[in-house]
């Protein structure tokens, strides 16, 4: 419970993406997040795989999103460099269809330290005025207290990430505008 409360305090939900914990139980959860961007599918895809340009540095181990990278090829790495020869594999690319979908497997961030496994799919669908991007992350396994305790915080991180990707694609800047 304390772990879930800590994660909830760290993560915030962005209004820039439609987010949903589609399913949640002690043994797993599924989150679905969607946005529509003002770009064609290939441009949206190319921006998405440049994760270091739009991911939030607050949700990295290094504190610097520029150290995040995705190798968009089968068995490619969604990795983070920690300097020198240190680093972490957050997810492994398992399916690549440029402009259409990217599938990754593993435990993103702190989930990689738990007894869980996940499958994340990024889908790119042409719609009127641009591209709909959908992040779906299904996680299963074991966590003391139940995985349902962290479904919301994980969903919030992914919603924020997708909102930042939307801003990056639409404006060139992933940072939300600050209104004084």
How would you name each of these model-derived features?
Residues 14-16:
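N-terminal signal peptide c-region/cleavage motif recognized by signal peptidases
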Residues 44-47, 78, 93, 104, ...:
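Hydrophobic pocket/interface hotspot
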Residues 33-35, 89-95, 118-126:
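Hydrophobic/aromatic beta-strand elements that line small-molecule binding cavities or substrate pockets
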Residues 1-4:
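Positively charged n-region of N-terminal signal peptides that target proteins for export
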């Amino acid at each position: 419970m304390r772990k879930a409360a800590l994660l909830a305090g760290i993560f915030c939900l962005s209004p820039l993406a439609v987010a949903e914990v589609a399913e949640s139980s002690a043994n797993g959860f599924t989150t679905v997040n969607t946005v529509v961007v003002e770009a064609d599918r290939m441009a949206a895809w190319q921006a998405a795989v440049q994760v270091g340009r739009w991911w939030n540095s607050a949700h990295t181990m290094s504190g610097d999103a520029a150290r995040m990278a995705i190798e968009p090829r089968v068995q490619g790495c969604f990795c983070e460099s920690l300097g020198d020869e240190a680093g972490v594999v957050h997810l492994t690319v398992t399916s690549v269809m440029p402009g259409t979908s990217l599938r990754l497997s593993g435990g993103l961030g702190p989930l990689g330290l738990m007894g869980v496994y996940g499958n994340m799919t990024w889908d790119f669908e042409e719609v009127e005025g641009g591209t709909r991007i959908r992040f779906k992350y299904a996680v299963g396994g074991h966590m003391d207290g139940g995985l349902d305790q962290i479904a919301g915080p994980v969903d919030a991180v992914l919603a924020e990430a997708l909102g930042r990707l939307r801003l990056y694609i639409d404006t060139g800047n992933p940072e939300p505008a600050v209104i004084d």
